[in-house]
Design a protein with these regions (language model features):
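Sec/Tat signal peptide C-region and signal peptidase I cleavage site
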Residues: 16-22
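Alpha-helical transmembrane segments
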Residues: 10, 15-16
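Flexible loop/hinge segments at secondary-structure junctions
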Residues: 22-340
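Bacterial N-terminal signal peptides that target proteins for export
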Residues: 1-10
Length: 340
């Protein structure tokens, strides 16, 4: 992990708008949505001249920074509970939907060739299954040549919303995992051979580097790095591959407007084509922000993303929020933020 350093990712582009109207916004948090936030920010800069400096430091870091009021908005894949939002004077809304995928580095195995269910995947990540030659893996993959070798588990080194989504799924499908490891942004991984990586990019780098390893990353990182992913058995009993269609299928049954604070996990969702480790990434804003001009620009940024950023999201295999949800956000969340 020595080469993985805490970094601030500065997003900029050539300004096509008058400098007098430009605003320098700041945000921090989840690495899960960083690829699409970068694309949206570039397009928003070209249209308005306003910059976004987004620190991709992990969901726990984003929550800490917004609570410390050092950024204009926080970003987290691990939704903040409604009571906590109320106590802190904040609002929360989902900005984008994506999928977390298990990725591996096993010689001779192609993407999607290995199929697993939730309990088996959970046993791998808690060290109950420690070799790729384990008969439980073989039984689920008849005809697939999987070479034996000790499994190295790659996890997030810091508090992470991606970890929260992933462990929420594992805990829902494995009682052993739920009771032994539990779900959360930062858990104690019991597997003897465990390696940490900073951010989704750090996990992707370590899985790529370490032979016979397995990790979990947001799908855009797996796709960008041409990683080998595992197909999973969903709640309906079907093996599915990760992509924007299976993520959308998983999210289809969620009525965000009826959830206090709009915060929920959508893992292990019903549906024939649902990807079981699907999640949303959330934005946190103060109702009465110290810098109201910047808060107004943040709202304009996400309104722009909702209206003009759908194609950009789909190109990276994210799922844009449905129109009904973004309309609800405009009327019931944005209006609670004081911008003057």
């Amino acid at each position: 992990m020595k080469f993985l350093l805490k970094k601030a990712l500065f997003i900029s582009a050539i300004s096509l708008a008058p400098a007098a109207f430009a605003v320098d916004m700041t945000g921090a948090g989840a690495t899960f949505p960083y690829p699409i936030y970068a694309k949206w920010a570039e397009a928003f800069k070209a249209k308005t001249g306003s910059n976004l400096n987004y620190q991709s430091i992990g969901s726990s870091g984003g929550i800490k920074q917004i609570k410390a009021k050092t950024v204009d908005f926080g970003a987290s894949d691990n939704p903040v509970k409604f009571d906590e939002l109320e106590a802190d004077g904040m609002v929360q809304f989902p900005a984008i939907i994506g999928g977390v995928v298990p990725v591996i580095n096993v010689d001779g195995v192609k993407p999607g060739e290995i199929k697993l269910d939730g309990p088996t995947l959970a046993d791998i990540f808690q060290g109950v299954i420690s070799d790729w030659g384990d008969k439980r893996i073989a039984i689920m993959n008849p005809g697939v040549k999987i070479p034996s070798g000790p499994i190295t588990v790659v996890v997030r080194a810091e508090g992470s919303g991606t970890t929260a989504i992933f462990t929420d799924y594992l805990a829902k499908t494995s009682t052993l995992f739920k009771d032994g490891v539990g779900a959360g942004a930062n858990v104690k991984w019991p597997a003897a051979s465990t390696v940490g990586g900073k951010g989704n990019e750090g996990v992707a780098a370590n899985v790529t580097r370490v032979k016979n390893s397995v990790g979990y990353v947001e799908y855009a990182y797996a796709k960008k790095n041409k990683m080998t992913y595992i197909n999973l058995k969903n709640k309906d009993g079907n093996f599915v591959a990760p992509d924007d269609l299976t993520f959308a299928a998983a999210a289809a049954g969620t009525d965000w407007s009826k959830i206090p604070g709009m915060g929920t996990f959508i893992t292990n969702a019903s549906g024939a084509k649902s990807w079981p480790i699907t999640g949303a990434s959330f934005i946190l804003l103060y109702k009465n922000p110290e810098n109201k001009a910047n808060a107004a620009e943040v709202i304009k940024f996400f309104d722009f993303a909702f209206k003009d950023g759908k194609k950009m999201a789909e190109e990276l295999d994210y799922v844009p929020m449905p129109d009904a949800t973004t309309d609800f956000i405009r009327k019931n969340v944005f209006t609670k933020v004081m911008t003057k």
